[in-house]
């Protein structure tokens, strides 16, 4: 099913509702974030997560992060995150992914052996509304075949990816992304901090 948004003048909330409907059915979407365009699905749906791995031809499974609407949502899906992680996320002035211990409640095929979950709270209107409406985290992985260059804008996304998703969000809701991957900081249960990517 090709489901590219064809409603050029659809209001933001209508586009959010269309994306959420696809996510609730177990579909995957191509959508703008605060960094680069991403492929996403309901992070609690293991079949949808597996579809993304197959679409990206990813051999390095269990490396995708999730977007959450708020810190309140984060704590529902990680049960051993130290308080400092939330302080750092709140103070961040650029997109930051926090690798947090104690992943719980998401699809098992998202959780690596060490039990962590990469989480970002996006500063992006479309994403925030979508996450609030869905009420669950959404997978966010770069919209490219593994090993290929990151697709910064929709125009950079390979046709294979576009054809492989169930819905493509209208690019006019892109906002002002940074056009580069987020920083990544890993937090230990005891508050240890390790910068993975600046």
Model-derived features with residue positions:
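Active-site-adjacent structural elements in enzyme catalytic cores
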Residues: 1-198
């Amino acid at each position: 099913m090709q489901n590219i948004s064809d409603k050029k003048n659809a209001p933001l909330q209508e586009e959010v509702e269309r994306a959420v409907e696809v996510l609730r059915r177990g579909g995957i979407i191509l959508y703008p974030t605060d960094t680069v365009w991403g492929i996403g699905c309901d992070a609690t749906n293991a079949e949808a997560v597996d579809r993304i791995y197959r679409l990206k031809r990813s051999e390095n499974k269990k490396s995708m992060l999730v977007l959450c609407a708020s810190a309140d949502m984060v704590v529902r899906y990680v049960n051993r995150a130290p308080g400092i992680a939330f302080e750092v996320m709140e103070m961040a002035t650029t997109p930051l992914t926090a690798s947090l211990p104690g992943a719980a409640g998401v699809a098992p095929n998202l959780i690596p052996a060490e039990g962590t979950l990469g989480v970002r709270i996006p500063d992006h209107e479309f994403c925030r509304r979508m996450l609030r409406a869905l009420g669950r985290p959404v997978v966010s992985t770069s919209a490219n075949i593994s090993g290929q260059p990151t697709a910064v804008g929709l125009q950079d996304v390979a046709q294979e990816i576009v054809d492989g998703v169930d819905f493509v969000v209208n690019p006019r809701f892109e906002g002002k992304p940074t056009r580069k991957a987020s920083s990544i900081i890993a937090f230990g249960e005891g508050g240890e901090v390790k910068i993975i990517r600046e």
